[in-house]
């Protein structure tokens, strides 16, 4: 029996990702410590305290509402956020590069200067999973600490046995690779990406903390430029996506991606609320109340910034 596939949005001539590849990717995320499931032909993982999200930005889903409500009931998440075809849902930008002649001229001027400075101290290239296991420990430790990752899922990322398991799961995913910036033998920043059809999609990026005068200060700038230039030059790749605008939006990250030469393209999201919450929150009054709580208290309780997902779910759930 043939396994189902999903069509990629905006692919040149159309492209698809197989059910088996999604299953392997689910295994990778699970090894990483993310609560993950493959349901309705869609790969989902937990996103923040309140929601679950479809993983691939460039792959619109055709999942039925009843399946999404079932997922929310089983996972006890309050909201689901997932990609849908154009013409439905809420439109947000995703950041895509299609220029096969990508070069420093694509970069914003200051971004280009940061790349030039970083290239004097750092080496950017594809790296092996064996290198990642041993050379990215400090990078992962600092990223987890910055994200408040202790004692949340992900702490095991620093354990040698967990890293071996992650590397093993990664090798099972077709065309899953790492691009990294090295400072000596240490990885200062890296980006994990996967290719399917003619699309390459960035999945996960970590970096070290850097002081103003540190040689690793602009590792992420060099990383994105080197990754984009190496990947778009592959004749099998016609486009690279480095994710969509987050909810809540992070303007600094949006600006970084645009300055790196990635251009906004429309991405349509659908929001669905848990069946027990939907009757109470699917209205403008509830969304406004949630916004007042979020704006008033998120400065003191940062996790409340994620209430914006609930606001959007209440406002957009009928789309």
Residue map of PLM features:
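Acidic-and-aromatic substrate-binding clefts and catalytic sites of carbohydrate-active enzymes
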Residues: 60-62, 132, 244-250
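Well-ordered, non-membrane alpha-helical segments in soluble/globular domains
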Residues: 61-71, 159-165, 220-226
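Long, charge-dense tracts
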Residues: 53-57
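Active-site/acyl-donor-binding loops of N-acyltransferases
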Residues: 2-27, 31-44, 85-104, 235-319
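Aromatic (often tryptophan-rich) hydrophobic motifs at membrane interfaces
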Residues: 168, 173-281
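A conserved beta-strand-loop-helix scaffold within acyl/acetyltransferase catalytic domains
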Residues: 2-47, 82-89, 97-215, 230-231
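Non-catalytic accessory segments adjacent to catalytic cores
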Residues: 59-94, 99
């Amino acid at each position: 029996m043939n396994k189902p596939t999903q069509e990629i949005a905006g692919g040149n001539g159309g492209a698809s990702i197989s059910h088996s590849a999604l299953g392997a990717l689910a295994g990778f995320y699970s090894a990483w410590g993310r609560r993950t499931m493959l349901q309705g032909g869609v790969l989902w993982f937990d996103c923040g305290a309140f929601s679950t999200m479809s993983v691939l930005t460039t792959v619109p889903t055709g999942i039925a509402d009843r399946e999404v409500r079932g997922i929310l009931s089983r996972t006890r998440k309050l909201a689901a956020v997932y990609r849908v075809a154009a013409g439905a849902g809420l439109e947000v930008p995703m950041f895509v590069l299609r220029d096969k002649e990508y070069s420093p001229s694509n970069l914003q001027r200051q971004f280009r200067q940061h790349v030039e400075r970083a290239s004097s101290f750092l080496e950017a290239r594809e790296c092996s999973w064996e290198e990642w296991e041993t050379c990215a420990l400090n990078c992962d430790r600092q990223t987890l600490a910055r994200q408040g990752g202790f004692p949340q899922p992900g702490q095991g990322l620093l354990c040698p046995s967990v890293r071996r398991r992650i590397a093993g799961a990664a090798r099972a995913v077709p065309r899953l690779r790492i691009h990294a910036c090295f400072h000596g033998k240490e990885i200062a920043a890296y980006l994990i990406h996967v290719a399917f059809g003619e699309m390459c999609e960035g999945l996960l990026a970590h970096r070290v903390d850097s002081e103003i005068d540190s040689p690793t200060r602009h590792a992420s700038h060099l990383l994105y430029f080197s990754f984009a230039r190496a990947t778009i030059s592959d004749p099998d790749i016609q486009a690279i996506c480095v994710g969509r605008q987050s909810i809540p939006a992070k303007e600094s990250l949006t600006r970084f991606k645009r300055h790196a030469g990635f251009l906004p393209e429309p991405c349509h999201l659908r929001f669905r609320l848990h069946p027990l919450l939907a009757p109470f929150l699917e209205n403008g009054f509830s969304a406004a109340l949630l916004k007042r709580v979020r704006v008033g208290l998120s400065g003191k309780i940062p996790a409340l910034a994620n209430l914006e997902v609930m606001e959007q779910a209440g406002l957009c759930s009928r789309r």
